[in-house]
Structure formats: structure tokens, C-alpha cells
Design a protein with these regions (language model features):
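Extended, low-polarity transmembrane helix blocks
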Residues: 2-82, 88, 93-107, 120-329
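Transmembrane-helix motifs of polytopic, lipid-linked glycan transferases
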Residues: 111-118
């Protein structure tokens, strides 16, 4: 026993020495999978940024009547110009047509949140993220109290995502790539992605149920998962919204357990309908699920993952049945 402990201590010391030495070696030898994992984490972080950003893009006026919100930040491009031609564009085209512009921003930032969090079309999302981050920086970088470097860093993050394998891990792109490979590993990738998202959704639903206990089940403004303090949120849900989220999670987990394409499709349909119901009530104060733009985008993430993985779940069984029928025929 004493010899075992001595050996274990030697291994721990050796491991710590190797880890410490690696900090001083040239940063040229990172394993491909480790780099992909870090890129995936950066992608998810960027997705959470956009997921929170959509929470205060509130139709129908997007802050125009009060001069706050999206309208106030857009007005900063004129009041505190960064690039005069851009300020002219905002003043003469964007502000006079602000409702159209506001909806465009909401759509683009929702798209960024969904694509980056789910790892779908990551390189396309990265390009859109660069453009959107640049437009935000050109609007508010010179506004008093703003930190210009935050916007240059946002641009840099999306450039990194564009040129790295950010869709290799925990991503729909990984499922698509595996499905196209000769090794036919698409089903395993789909199982991992759908199962992982099912767990995340279930934990979120449990927390939402706990926070909404004692409140009106159909309260127009549900409990928020996260908050403005850290600028991180997975949406807000009343008890009904939390139950719907739990149903989606249960369907996704059942789909991975039973290798069922139909259950995955069902999860996608429920999530898509929930998101659509929230979008149908944008601008109202009596949302059925107690949700927000962020809640709708989170449901859309679940829908995208469910539909994207459905075709691969149970694929091996279906191929075996087809082969058996062919032999029997």
C-alpha cells in the first residue's frame, strides 16, 4: 500500500512537471482534437453572447418611442460618430426605417445564437458574426462609457471561428461531416449531440420549474434562467413554458435511448411550435409560455438539433432491416 502511494505521488509530480513545462514550450504543438475542443468552447461562448443580446431587442418599436434600447444604441452612431460615412448611412437610411431595421437585427442575432450554439453552418455564422460585430462597433465604439476593445474582440472571436474546426465537437456540422464519411459514424455523433442537448434542456427545465413554483402557471413574465448581472441567460419561462421545455428534453433523450427518428422529429416539432408561439406574441405582455426572444431562440436551438439528428438516429437498424428484406426477397 505504501509502495502504491509512493508510485502515485511520483506520477502526480511527473504529470505536474510536464504540465508546467508545457507552459514554456513554443505554442506550436497543440493536438488537433484539443484545438477543436477549445474552438468549440469559444463558439458556444459566442453563441451565448448573441443569445443574451436578443433579449433586449423588443418589438414592435425596438425602443424608438422611449429613445432607449436598440434605437438608442443606433442613434449613438450619429451622436458619437466612429466613421462619418457609416453615421450618414444610419441617419439617412436606418433611422427613418427603423422598424424594418429592428426586425432585421433581431433575425440576424437570433440566427447567430442558434447557429453558433448548435454548431450549424459555423463558418457562415462566423462571417455573419464578423459583419454584425463590426456594425455594432461602428455604432457605439465612441459612445461615452463604452469600451471599444470589446467590439474588436468580438470581431476577432468570429474570425477565429471562421478559420478553425469550431464545428468538429458538439455540433450539427460534426453530425453532417460524420454522416458523409465512409466510416458511417453519423449515428454516434447524432446520439451524442441530441443526448447532450437533451440533458441541457432537462436541467434548464428543472431549474425553471423550481423558480416558478408558487407563481401563476401562466404568468406573462416567467422566471429568468440567468440574469443581467453576468449578461448570460437561457430565457425566461413560466410553469407551462418549463413543462414544455421538459417535454422537448424528454423526447430528445428518449430518441437517443431508443434510436428513434420519429421521437427526434416530435421533439423538433414541439420545440418549433413553442418558438413560433413566442414569436407570435412578440411585443405583448401576456406571452403564453412566459418567455422572451431568448426563450424562443433557445427553443429554436432544440428544434435545429432534433431535426438535424433525426435522420441519423436508428440509421444502422434501418439499414439492417433493408438488407434483411433484400436478402429475404
Amino acid at each position: 500500500m505504501r509502495r502504491y502511494r509512493r508510485r502515485l505521488r511520483q506520477v502526480q509530480i511527473t504529470g505536474a512537471s510536464i504540465a508546467l513545462a508545457s507552459l514554456f514550450r513554443p505554442a506550436t504543438d497543440a493536438p488537433a482534437r484539443a484545438s477543436a475542443g477549445v474552438a468549440a468552447a469559444l463558439r458556444i461562448l459566442a453563441g451565448l453572447l448573441w443569445l443574451y443580446n436578443v433579449s433586449w431587442k423588443r418589438p414592435p418599436d425596438f425602443g424608438k418611442d422611449s429613445g432607449n434600447g436598440l434605437y438608442g444604441f443606433t442613434q449613438d452612431a450619429v451622436d458619437h460618430p466612429v466613421l462619418p460615412p457609416f453615421s450618414w448611412l444610419v441617419e439617412t437610411i436606418v433611422l427613418p426605417n427603423f422598424a424594418f431595421f429592428g426586425w432585421g437585427v433581431l433575425v440576424v442575432e437570433t440566427l447567430l445564437a442558434v447557429l453558433l450554439l448548435t454548431g450549424t453552418l459555423v463558418r457562415l455564422a462566423a462571417i455573419v458574426g464578423v459583419v454584425q460585430s463590426l456594425s455594432i462597433g461602428l455604432s457605439v465604439a465612441q459612445t461615452p462609457g463604452e469600451w471599444p476593445w470589446s467590439y474588436w474582440l468580438m470581431i476577432g472571436v468570429h474570425v477565429v471561428l471562421l478559420f478553425t474546426a469550431a464545428g468538429r465537437i458538439a455540433a450539427v456540422d460534426a453530425v453532417r461531416g460524420a454522416a458523409q464519411s465512409r466510416r458511417h459514424t453519423g449515428e454516434l455523433a447524432a446520439h451524442r449531440l441530441a443526448g447532450g442537448w437533451g440533458i441541457v434542456l432537462l436541467l434548464t427545465a428543472v431549474l425553471a420549474v423550481a423558480l416558478s413554483m408558487g407563481d401563476d402557471p401562466s404568468a406573462p413574465s416567467g422566471a429568468t434562467i440567468g440574469g443581467p448581472g453576468l449578461s448570460v441567460s437561457l430565457g425566461s419561462y413560466n410553469l407551462i413554458g418549463a413543462v414544455v421545455l421538459a417535454v422537448v428534453a424528454a423526447l430528445m433523450l428518449a430518441a437517443t435511448t431508443l434510436h428513434s427518428r420519429m421521437l427526434a422529429v416530435a421533439a423538433g416539432v414541439v420545440a418549433a411550435v413553442a418558438a413560433a408561439s413566442l414569436y407570435a406574441q412578440l411585443g405583448r405582455t401576456d406571452a403564453w409560455l412566459g418567455g422572451s426572444n431568448t426563450s424562443a431562440a433557445f427553443f429554436l436551438c432544440a428544434a435545429v438539433v432534433s431535426f438535424a439528428t433525426a435522420g441519423q438516429l436508428g440509421r444502422t437498424r434501418r439499414q439492417s432491416r433493408t438488407a434483411a428484406r433484400a436478402v429475404g426477397g
